[in-house]
Amino acid sequence: YRAFFTFGKTTDTLDSFGVLVEEKDFVFDKDAMKNALKSLEGVQMQIPPAYSALSVNGVRAYTLARKGVSPDLPPRRVEIYSLDLVRQVEEKVFCIDIECSGGTYVRSICRDVAQKLGTVGYMSGLIRIASGKFSTENACTLKEVEENPESCVLPLTEPLNEFPETIVEDRFYKDLSNGVKIPTN
């Protein structure tokens, strides 16, 4: 991911769509920022944001949060492979590159970095620059799509090449079509 973190203020959703709930002083110190980012690399237990799709007793956390109820969300195991400061965009806005495991909340990373810096923060922007073997580096530009769309379309089998082929018995077709787990061997 390429994320944009704004420090010195935060919102109820930990992103730019939320309501401002707190402001706190923030003065940029490059060494402190790099140390805060480095300290979050590795395996950790991360507390998800209150505004998330996780279920709490069958109810989405964001539903509870919208009603003013703080959902009790247990920490989840995540791994942050790297957190790199790319550049300072504005006085209190920073561009950060993040490589992390699935299930990691970038909004929570921002909150946690801010806490380590003695302030508050929210995620003011997010771009997914890679997913699996797909990345923005090998993506077509809009101009390329307009000029030669066929050259920008991958075969349907391309996204699945990294997975082993599995032959499924006919009797499992309906279950598989409906997303039900089926036995494999």
Indicate where each model-derived feature is located:
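Residue-level signal for inorganic ion chemistry
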Residues: A3, G58, I109, L176
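The conserved catalytic core of RNA pseudouridine synthases
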Residues: P71-G118
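Acidic, low-complexity central loop/insert segments
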Residues: Y1-M45
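Extended alpha-helical targeting/anchoring segments
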Residues: S52, V56-Y81
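Accessory RNA 3′-end/elbow-binding domains used by RNA modification enzymes
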Residues: F4-T6, D31-N35, V93, D97, ...
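Short, surface-exposed recognition loops or helix-turn segments adjacent to catalytic cores
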Residues: I47-N57, G125-A130
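Short, conserved beta-turn/loop elements at beta-strand boundaries and strand-helix junctions
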Residues: T11, G42, L73-P74, R87-E91, ...
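Short, acidic (Asp/Glu-rich) active-site segment that either coordinates a divalent metal cofactor
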Residues: Y1-D15, D72-L73, C110, T119-G125
